[in-house]
Amino acid sequence: MKVSVLITLAVLGVMFLLTSAEERGSDQMDSPAWLKSMERIFQSEERECRWLFGGCEKDSDCCEHLGCRRAKPSWCGWDFTVGK
């Protein structure tokens, strides 16, 4: 019973958002500002180094305090150092 009420409320919320977007105009519905801001979050970035568990070929591929573990497949692992 609780699940069906939650699903109904979710559907009504989505319908409300769609109808309010239609009232504002199709240009705002196609590219809302929040969608553009979310787009920036998920864009891939070129990084200078590989993070923990990232693929590598040599120690210099990995970020600071990480070293290339040459088990197959090679990956960046903590080199047991701390500090700046």
UniProtKB/Swiss-Prot annotation:
- Keyword Iron listed? The answer is no
Chain residues in the propeptide:
22-47
Q: What does the record say about tissue specificity?
A: Expressed by the venom gland.
Valine amide, modified sites: V82
* Disulfide bridge partners, by residue number: C49-C63, C56-C68, C62-C76
Matching entries from Pfam families are given as:
Toxin_12
So which residues are the signal peptide here? 1-21
GO MF term set: ion channel inhibitor activity; toxin activity
Of the GO CC terms on this record, one is: extracellular region
Q: What keywords were assigned to this record?
A: Amidation, Disulfide bond, Ion channel impairing toxin, Knottin, Secreted, Signal, Toxin
UniProt-annotated location(s): Secreted
Domain comment quoted from the record: The presence of a 'disulfide through disulfide knot' structurally defines this protein as a knottin.
> What family classification does the UniProt entry report for this protein?
Belongs to the neurotoxin 10 (Hwtx-1) family. 05 (F4a) subfamily.
Q: What does this protein do?
A: Probable ion channel inhibitor.
User: What is the official name of this protein in its record?
Assistant: U21-theraphotoxin-Cg1a 3
